Amino acid sequence: MGKQKKTRKYATMKRMLSLRDERLKEKDRLKPKKKEKKDPSALKEREVPQHPSCLFFQYNTQLGPPYHILVDTNFINFSIKAKLDLVQSMMDCLYAKCIPCITDCVMAEIEKLGQKFRVALRIAKDPRFDRLPCTHKGTYADDCLVQRVTQHKCYIVATVDRDLKRRIRKIPGVPIMYLSNHRYNIERMPDDYGAPRF
């Protein structure tokens, strides 16, 4: 008996008129949309994002010492694993003064990782690191870094994440610092800096 009542309860539906129903008044009725015919001879409009004036083709003129380097979460973790001092290794790679920058999203991501990554958190809170405030919603660090780099072309992105590297390679004029063979390397740098590749 109880089972029948339940099924009857779910089976009852609120019956509503369709917006195309003839019983509705003319003004309330939904009119069928007519498809516009496309003219094949018309020129197609394309939206191309305007590139900043600091770019000369792929060469970014805003990059210069002291270098501002946006650091990702996994870059700090892998640097600790490789026993590298972040600031000193960056200077060895670029032969110039480097200012590591860390966004609120990256900081929140490191804090979420918990007790296991407390060394990374201590390094991220180093006074030599610049703290960049985030105004957007959410704390997904990859989106935050990509958005910041797209807006301002004065940063180098330090990451080991393949997906993030792939996304940043699509943005012209942004170099990527990564870790290989226990040293930092840099790709897409306008001047030929970087540790030698073996």
From Swiss-Prot:
Identify the coding gene: Fcf1
Q: What InterPro entries does this protein's entry cite?
A: Fcf1/Utp23 (IPR006984), Fcf1_PIN (IPR037503), PIN-like_dom_sf (IPR029060), PIN_dom (IPR002716)
Question: In which organism is this protein found?
Answer: Mus musculus
In this chain the PINc domain maps to: 67-166
Q: Taxonomically, which superkingdom?
A: Eukaryota
Summary of subunit composition and partner proteins? Part of the small subunit (SSU) processome, composed of more than 70 proteins and the RNA chaperone small nucleolar RNA (snoRNA) U3.
Provide the function of this protein: Part of the small subunit (SSU) processome, first precursor of the small eukaryotic ribosomal subunit. During the assembly of the SSU processome in the nucleolus, many ribosome biogenesis factors, an RNA chaperone and ribosomal proteins associate with the nascent pre-rRNA and work in concert to generate RNA folding, modifications, rearrangements and cleavage as well as targeted degradation of pre-ribosomal RNA by the RNA exosome.
Coarse class of the protein's main subcellular location: nucleus
Q: Which family does it belong to?
A: Belongs to the UTP23/FCF1 family. FCF1 subfamily.
Per its record, how is this protein called by name? rRNA-processing protein FCF1 homolog
What are the Basic and acidic residues biased-composition ranges? 37-47
